[in-house]
Amino acid sequence: MKKFLIAILLLILILAGVASFSYYKMTEFVKTPVNVQADELLTIERGTTSSKLATLFEQEKLIADGKLLPYLLKLKPELNKIKAGTYSLENVKTVQDLLDLLNSGKEVQFNVKWIEGKTFKDWRKDLENAPHLVQTLKDKSNEEIFALLDLPDIGQNLELKNVEGWLYPDTYNYTPKSTDLELLKRSAERMKKALNKAWNERDEDLPLANPYEMLILASIVEKETGIANERAKVASVFINRLKAKMKLQTDPTVIYGMGENYNGNIRKKDLETKTPYNTYVIDGLPPTPIAMPSESSLQAVANPEKTDFYYFVADGSGGHKFTRNLNEHNKAVQEYLRWYRSQKNAK
């Protein structure tokens, strides 16, 4: 009986020693430095087991030997709540850091910045150049993308199927495996809400038949001025001209209508050439927006300043001088030309 008890005691001591040694090895293992390259990303697929994770760590050369990892995750189940995704290893120093990151679910974020006043053509280039974004639209026409975005019928000639103006300018974050269409849908939803809000809060006497006309005019205001406190005044000029049945005569629409033929200059011939967008020739608004307007431009059109201005011209300081009639406008143009020549001669 005594020998049996001694054997049991020895076995307990051995097991305790093994457990203690194993715990020590696990403690040391989590301190193992991880070999991380600059800007390295690690993708964990859904359903990855602890043994597959160990193999992945070895294949990615993060650690030399991963055989202890499955045992560690059994010993510390709180570390085995790993979430699928793609992670930046920028701040990972040890195995413990790596496991903490994978358990956090904090995937790496990328972003694409879409600027107000740019066109859908510009934004498509931004999408195509966005890193780690799944490209599903590269071979799609603008008309096909229009259909995929499920845009509302609020006055637009749907035969045109033009995405222009329908996307909300902002910085959009995304994770790897996100698609370009997902980003466009997020942007389109925000623009729908912003446009609906502006339309519902608009002045009652606006000469605009529907929200789409508001979107068109907001895009023109966006292109005409980058100064926030000028937008409502610029909008008032166009609203006044529409009410008076005057042509809008705004250069950005001419440029948009010229497309690839625009080389940085507008000639008299260009102002006289009829295109759907040449507001020196056509009456009223062009058929579609000419750029992506900001929400502040939408609000400026919805609630323009109450003015009797019908003209404006650059004032040389980045802003504009607003005038009531053609005579005042011509004088303002001459003032600007004198300023321009003086600046040119000073160089």
From Swiss-Prot:
The record marks 224 as: Important for catalytic activity. Its main location: membrane. This is Endolytic murein transglycosylase. It comes from Haemophilus influenzae (strain ATCC 51907 / DSM 11121 / KW20 / Rd). GO terms for biological process: cell wall organization; peptidoglycan biosynthetic process. It catalyses: a peptidoglycan chain = a peptidoglycan chain with N-acetyl-1,6-anhydromuramyl-[peptide] at the reducing end + a peptidoglycan chain with N-acetylglucosamine at the non-reducing end. Its EC number is 4.2.2.29. Functions as a peptidoglycan terminase that cleaves nascent peptidoglycan strands endolytically to terminate their elongation. Coiled coil: none annotated. GO terms for cellular component: plasma membrane. GO terms for molecular function: lytic endotransglycosylase activity. The keyword Transmembrane applies. It comes from the Bacteria. Belongs to the transglycosylase MltG family. The keyword Transferase does not apply. It is a single-pass membrane protein. The chain crosses the membrane at residues 4-24. Pfam families: YceG. It is found in: Cell inner membrane. InterPro entries: MLTG-like (IPR003770).
